[in-house]
Structures are given as C-alpha cells and as structure tokens.
C-alpha cells in the first residue's frame, strides 16, 4: 500500500464526511429528485410518474442496497492506493486503470455543463436581489432570455459561469484544505436553508394536499419504470461512476473508518433529497403551478411558485443560494478528480492543472449554454430509433448519463468484485480488522453479483430505452 506522503489529506472525519456529502449533494438532489418523486399520480389534474411515498421507499431501498455498496467499493479502491482514480484502479491491476480513466473523463465532461448551471444559480441570486420584478413578469421568458432568446447570452453563458468556475478553481488551489474548509461552512448552511425552506413550504395554505401526496403510500403505483428511475436516481445522486469518491477516499488515512463514513454520507445525501421533496412538492400543490420537470424547472417553474407565495422574493433568494451551495460543493469534487489525475499522471503542478482545466471547461461550457436557445449546435447519438442529432447540451448529457457514468461504475464494481476480490475490499474497509463489519457477507454478494447486474440494467435502459439516470 502506498503512503499519503506529498499528497493532500483530510484533517478530520467531519471534514471528509461533509466534503463527500457535499459532492453527493448536488443540483440533482434538489430539483431532479422531487420531479421524479412526483412523476406519476396526479397534481391539479396532471398525470405524474409514481405516487410519491411509494417512490420514496423504493428510492431509499435502492440507496441502501446499491448506492452504499458501490460507494463502499469506490472508497476502498481509493484508500487502498492513495492515488487518483486511474492510478487507484491500476494499483489493483495494470489492465484495469481504464475503469478509473472512464470516471475521470466522465467527471470532466459533466464539469463542463455543471459550471454553466452553477453560473445560472448565481445569475438568479443577482436577479432576486436586483430585478425580481423582471423575473416575475414572465419567469419562462426571463429564463430563456438568460439562455439567449433575446441575443447573445453574455451573462448566462459567460459572466456568471466564469465567476462560478473561478470560485471552484480558487477553492481547489488550496488542495484538500480548501475543500474541507469550504465544506465545513457551506454544508451546514445548506442544511439550515433547506430545512427553513421546507418548513415554509409545508406551512403554505393548501400544502396539506402535497404532504398527503408525499406520505400516503400506494404500492400499486410502482411499476418497473418507477423502479428503474429510483435506481438511476440513487446511483447518480451519490456521485458514483465519476472517480470522485475514489479520489476523495485516497486522501484518507488508513485509520479512518470507511464503513461508518459510507453510511453517514449516504444518509446525509438521502436526507437532502427527501427534504427537497418536502420543500418543493407541497409548494407545487399549494400554488397550482404546473410541475413540469424539464431543464427549466428550478429557474422558470419555481420562479412562478415564489411569485405566488407571501414573501416569495426572500424565499426565492434563499432557494437560489441553496442551489448555489449545492452546485459549488459538487463542482469542486468533480474538478478535483481531473486535477488529481493531471498532477499524478501527467506531472502538472496544481495551479497549472487548474488553469488548463478551467480554460477547456469554460470553452465547452459556453457552447453547452449557446446550444440551448441561441445557436443550432448539435451532436450525434445512436438510439433504437436510429441516428439522432440532439442539441449539443443534450448530447453531453446523453453521453455522460446514459453511457459513461454507468459504464465507469460497471467496470469499477467488476474490478472490485472479480479482479481485486470482495474479500480484499472488506479488508481495506475494516482497516485490516480494526473495525467490525457485520454486513460483510451481504456486501460481498452485492458487489460481486447484484451491483453489476443493476448497473447493467441502467446501461440497457439508457441506451435502448433512452432513460436518463440523472
């Protein structure tokens, strides 16, 4: 086992847990999870995807069975080698470094559009401070204007994403110490804002219908599609398949308890998703706003919700701060995977790696936003319907969500389960017997048999049926 000499290292268990939870808690927890929890059933006469409480239970089961075991596998790989994602898998077998390489590539591509959306959260913070009336006049038009409907989207594609990217790089310029300090500040603030907004939403007139929808279990609404969606959401929500958890665990000492750390991170991530559901769905019921869950939901749809509630401008401002905190804690972790790779595999200094990565991420990201409305930029995708030409932004999401993310995770669990062996993974998780792991037999079975099958199903659902796991 290599040492952590000359590498960053988390200074405390709390610092690692908050950093890993910050990575897992992203934009998808706050706006995509409530949308999927509200995707069948009926709100104001609108057919949705599954009765919410039943979906929540299925989601929690998927996190407990699939999410925790895949995360544990990634943690053990990273801590075993104390290297970047590619180097950690290569330490298991020279032939399997590509499993980590896929994760690094996936994270880099996601970072390109994640920093753009992070910039949008900053734009909306500014909007709610300086021009809330313009947002309320027509929330959809304001959102589309930010994307270029009224001319080149200087603020939406360049200025605010550039500020967000600079902030991400600045935090990472201080290494693991920067990540840890940021997480210790932003994660508690995120929970305070989330709980406060959840309480406000649940006390709105008419919110009781949303609460009933969230809490009334009807298993007859659960079908194979809902199970697949819950599985995909649980997988994506925990930042698996990007090499992030491998990289973060590589900054742990051999005395850290990976078993308890895995459980705590998964619980915190799930709590954020559940709290977000109780924050958004009751408000949707209370205001009668159409809960369309497309890409503009957090910006166009929820702006309409805030307009309709007392004190909406204040709560809207707090909500976009919440989104910003979630975005920046995730963007730093995603970028760190790339930076660690460039430092250790290519010999770059940290600041040089940050500069080069930021430039490329920014350029690609600009085209992501421009393709939404302003320019007709397309990619190419092959599906069961033949060759398609989605807009460039959708192409990037298809590439990561439907192919690279689950593919990287699949190779990761195959490597742990069949090349390295679950027994060695358990030995690493317990710090060579220092910690007790009573569920070790279950973990071994999951990582060797169940996890590869489940992830394979996600890949088939994405490539054949077009299901996006995020």
Describe these PLM feature segments.
Residues 2-10, 14, 180, 184-328, ...:
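Membrane-embedded translocation segments of transport machinery
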Residues 4-7, 35-50, 80-102, 115-177, ...:
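Inter-helical loop and helix-membrane interface segments of multi-pass membrane transporters/permeases
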Residues 12-60, 249, 259-263, 267-268, ...:
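Transmembrane helix-boundary motif of multi-pass solute transporters/channels
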Residues 13, 18-20, 58-94, 115, ...:
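Juxtamembrane transmembrane-helix boundary signature
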Residues 102, 346-358, 397-455:
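C-terminal membrane-solvent junction of multi-pass transporters and transport-like membrane proteins
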Residues 1-32, 70-75, 79-91, 97-98, ...:
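Membrane-interface "cap" regions at the ends of multi-pass membrane proteins
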Residues 15, 157-158, 268-274, 313-316, ...:
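Loop-to-transmembrane helix boundary motifs in multi-pass membrane proteins
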Residues 2-3, 40-46, 118-151, 251-255, ...:
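Helix-loop-helix connectors at the membrane interface of multi-pass transporters/channels
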